[in-house]
Amino acid sequence: MIKVDTLINLLKKNNTNFFTGVPDSVLKELSSYLKNQRNHIIATSEGSAVSIGIGHYLSTKKIPCIYMQNSGLSNALNPLISIAHKKVYSIPLILIIGWRGSPKVKDEPQHNVKGKITREILKLLNIKYTILRSNKDFKKFDKQIKHAKKNNTIVACLIEQGTLHKNSRSSSKKDFYSLDKEYFLKTLIKEIPTRSKVISSTGYNSRELMYLRKKFNLNKSKDFYMVGGMGHTSSVALGYSLASKNNIFCIDGDGAFLMHLGSIMTAGNFAKKNFKYILLNNNSHDSVGGQSTNADNINFEKLSKSLGFKKFYSIKNKQNLLKITKNFIKMNGPAFLEVKVTNSKIKKLPRPDNLIKIKNEFMKK
């Protein structure tokens, strides 16, 4: 195991003092360490984080540090290849990558796929990397950073689950809103009509939905759980809704909403009356450490209408919750419902595992 302080000190020794990225459960101790620091920006997507880092280098000539989960490496490929690559603008960057699905760690199916090819992706990009497992690995990483500085190239380190020591700056997640998320979801799935379809986003949303279905035997509608593809739930829901007469309910989170905001605009402008979008807004990246998304600063009523949605609803407490939920369900879409909720309170949430069965059940008419 390694301490976050040791990693940060190595970076600072190499004159790297700027950090940006997308929160990851493997790297949550790093996020906790960087919390509230002026030289740290939580980006909405990995590509955005890389681009922010590029801008920092162009202004300061100092190499930035960009962190992400390896599942988000695909989002980062465009600016990494078309801007920062040695054969393009040759901009030095330091990548810290949380390595889900590494060969030494048992993980979920979607992470196993990406974990297996992560090193090959870095090799294809000619990015030198170090697997950080203990303090002895810092010597190699330090050499690679110095090489990156000298030759204006990109360098990376891979960090596996459980590698980072819990640091003294770690803090428990705090709720920004008071409405219990489980209470709303239970109410929603009780009211959703038979033959309706639900597509829910990655993270806790899908796992909570699956848990509540089973616990209370609420299985009259079918769900598709987005175990990956953060930010793409609304697009999958849109594609389904355009070819179906069934009502489609898209359950999303604020972090995912912001990651690919343009997709919501597409849904608002092209969806039919059977499309219902539900934003569970807890103002945090709940499943990866509770870091703030700053979604509390957004007026979702004005935003949703400017993105093409015909109707907006809002729920922030139990008062009129059932009435508003019923009205939202009955309303012709595309309709948008923002629900201000707490972080997840359910312990030991199950994970979708038999994914082919889930897909086949969902596709039944």
Regions found by a protein language model. Name each.
Residues 105-147, 291-327:
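Conserved thiamine diphosphate
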Residues 150, 272-293:
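A short, conserved beta-to-alpha structural element at the edge of catalytic cores
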Residues 3-15, 169-230:
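Active-site diphosphate/adenylate-binding microenvironment
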Residues 29-98, 207-282:
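Thiamine diphosphate
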Residues 31-32, 77-79, 105-109, 166-172, ...:
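Short acidic, glycine/serine/threonine-rich loops at helix termini
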Residues 75-79, 83, 154-194, 330-365:
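Glycine/aspartate-rich loop-and-adjacent alpha/beta segment that forms the canonical ThDP
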Residues 24-26, 100-101, 159-165, 202-206, ...:
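Glycine-rich beta-alpha junction loops
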